[in-house]
């Protein structure tokens, strides 16, 4: 069993996130959406098994800046997974706060590991996943969360987007992305869509200056 879970790639979290998102988008096709959600849930559990039973190898994997930044999609997927759990409103709120706390802790871990000191060699488009990803929490935010908290999350992730675009583009100009990692260039199209979706879902009205910049 342990050998099996050690073979589960952390990159599976990105596929799981995509499947959860697709399930939410086609929820009017109930049977298909539920099937996709079930498939995504199986993938989510496989990653959990990898984290628990293959922890030592996970620690080694997270020394790679691409793997470490893309793995933040696991926390994004966790928000979508938890939103469909049969919990009371209080339980959903506690789970949401707990996941947000874990995500913030992971951001701190990543920042301490890869930004001290900051090196362009360590910067990749997948950094958007880690620093803009928390915006997905607004897609499943409980009604009990104050508007000020929602606005803070949207504002911080919006500013992170504005800061990361020039940094990532400068890195790509100065140092070419290795061929192995070129597929992650597709991530560049995701941050703005996520911010817009999050602002709509949470009924937030971002500051005009941020909207103009985006």
Model-derived segments and their meaning:
Residues 1, 41-57, 99-116, 135, ...:
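Hydrophobic, membrane-facing alpha-helical anchors
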Residues 1-21, 55-80, 96, 112-139, ...:
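Juxtamembrane helix-loop boundaries in multi-pass membrane proteins
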């Amino acid at each position: 069993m342990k050998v099996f879970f050690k073979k589960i790639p952390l990159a599976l979290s990105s596929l799981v996130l995509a499947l959860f998102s697709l399930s939410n988008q086609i929820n009017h096709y109930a049977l298909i959406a539920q099937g996709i959600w079930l498939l995504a849930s199986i993938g989510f559990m496989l990653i959990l098994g990898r984290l628990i039973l293959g922890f030592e190898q996970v620690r080694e994997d997270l020394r790679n800046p691409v793997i470490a930044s893309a793995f933040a999609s696991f926390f994004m997927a966790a928000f979508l997974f938890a939103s469909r759990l049969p919990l009371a409103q209080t339980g959903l709120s506690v789970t949401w706060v707990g996941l947000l706390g874990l995500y913030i802790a992971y951001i701190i871990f990543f920042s301490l590991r890869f930004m001290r000191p900051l090196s362009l060699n360590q910067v990749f488009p997948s950094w958007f996943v880690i620093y803009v990803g928390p915006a997905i929490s607004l897609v499943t935010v409980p009604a009990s969360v104050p508007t000020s908290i929602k606005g803070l999350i949207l504002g911080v992730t919006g500013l992170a987007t504005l800061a990361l675009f020039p940094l990532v583009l400068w890195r790509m100009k100065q140092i070419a992305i290795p061929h192995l990692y070129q597929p992650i260039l597709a991530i560049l199209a995701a941050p703005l869509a996520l911010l817009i979706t999050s602002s709509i879902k949470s009924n937030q009205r971002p500051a005009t200056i941020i909207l103009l910049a985006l």
